[in-house]
Amino acid sequence: INALAEKYDMPILYSCHPRSRKRLEATGFKLDPRVRMHEPMGFHDYNCLQMNSFAVVSDSGTLPEESSFFASVGRPFPAVCIRTSTERPEALDKACFTLAGISERGLLQAVRTAVELDAEGSLPEAPVPDYADETVSTKVVKIIQSYTGVVDKMVWRKSL
């Protein structure tokens, strides 16, 4: 976070989970004065922040869906996830966000790339197709129903 504040010389809002705050305090880690710690936000407030940010850097598992959704409504934003893997490879395949890893070098490179693509107008403009599927609930019900017998027999050892 400090490296981003130094490189871009702009305020950074750090929506900090209470456990993270305690850990930072326990280690004595000092944040750059441009980094402003903030209590976790509600979903609506956080979405408004995302739409109006220079870039969004998060370890949230919902970042892929959020970046895909905002692209679909014409408000794409540079999204960078500080993780080494994702549960949403389909969003990665559609370039809705960038995985930065957890190193300072990887983070700086990912943010630079995402911001440059945004400046060029090269961020995705369409959502991940799976996320736009309006029949997903029906599909999930059918999948669960289809596997109930197999799971009962093989996992729970129920006699049918």
Where are these regions (language model features)?
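Nucleotide-activated sugar donor-binding and catalytic core shared by glycosyltransferases
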Residues: 2-10, 15, 20-160
